[in-house]
Regions:
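Bulky hydrophobic segments
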Residues: 2-111, 115, 119-134
Length: 134
């Protein structure tokens, strides 16, 4: 018996193409960069000084949770893991800041901003057509 060779004109099924694998690698790289940035921003012994812009702290909190959420989803991590772990991490990070970092303080509003960033990332992921995700 001879095996039929696939018709190159037909779309491939099964494993992702080389382009898809390459794109996923980029999302994984961005995810790791975002996670490292998140750890530095959340757990630095003292909050970095800067201009006092109203609401900037909340935007930063939303960003350091939203970016890893979006990159993880785009990398193909199941949404339940992304949402579960990051939503759990939000209050934990505030508790650590309040109890273990003397020059930092925990804030419920920061936790709300964290979860808002995660929700915005999920919303962005859902509106990106699947064919454009990777």
């Amino acid at each position: 018996m001879t095996r039929a060779t696939p018709d190159p004109a037909l779309p491939r099924t099964g494993a992702p193409s080389g382009t898809a694998r390459g794109s996923r690698r980029v999302w994984w790289l961005l995810l790791w960069v975002a996670l490292i940035t998140q750890m530095v921003v959340l757990y630095a012994p003292s909050a970095p000084g800067g201009p006092e812009v109203s609401g900037l702290d909340k935007v930063i909190h939303a960003s350091v949770f939203g970016a890893p959420a979006l990159f993880a989803l785009l990398a193909g991590v199941p949404p339940r893991w992304v949402l579960g772990l990051l939503v759990l991490h939000a209050p934990v990070s505030e508790l650590v800041q309040a109890t273990m970092l003397p020059s930092r303080d925990g804030d419920v509003a920061d936790g709300v901003a964290d979860v808002t960033g995660i929700a915005l990332a999920l919303g962005a992921f859902m509106v990106i057509p699947p064919t454009r995700r990777w």
